[in-house]
Amino acid sequence: PRAMGMLDEPSISRQWVARRLQRALSIERWCGSLREGFARKPDRLGQILRTHSCNAESRALSLESMIRATGSEPYGSWGLGFKSAARLGGSILAHLSLRLKYETAELVAKHTLSEYVSLVAFLEDAPGIDRALPDAIEPMQVQTLYELEELNKIKLEI
């Protein structure tokens, strides 16, 4: 028999799941605003990043619902000023250099994907969690992987 760990207790496990979902939500909000700023420059990459920003907002809304389903309430670590600052930063980067905009967008996509990979791995082992939750997260992970692959195709053009 294996020793029981702290996360084997279902109530603690649910709290950790809510925190991991909140972390993914914060990343989506921040990265979505940054991508929205990148999209202010009307080039092909900007159009793609506008779509990625809309996808991030959609995923964020889903994550909020999932957080509520775990019995928690999503907290706002991003206000209007925060979103505006991220958008402005993205807009400034977008106008400085196409390569810099691309490299930053790629880092954001990799970071977002890694968060979903970690979240899915964590959820698979978490006791007391509805097994439908990892299944609901997986399409988000696939979508972020597709976004990264889409950026990698553009890399060949730059």
Give, region by region, the residue ranges found by the protein language model.
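Transmembrane helix-bundle signature of multi-pass membrane transporters/permeases
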Residues: H52-N55, A109, P139-M140
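Acidic/histidine-rich alpha-helical segments that form the ligand environment
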Residues: V17-A39, S84-E138
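Terminal targeting/low-complexity segments that flank the catalytic cores of oxidoreductases
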Residues: P1-L21, I158
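Carboxylate-rich helix-loop segments that flank metal/cofactor sites and access channels
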Residues: P1-G5, S65-L100, L107
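A structural signal for well-ordered alpha-helices, especially hydrophobic packing surfaces
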Residues: G32, A60, E64-I67, G89, ...
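Conserved alpha-helical segments that form or flank metal/cofactor-binding pockets of metalloenzymes
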Residues: D43-G81, L151-I154
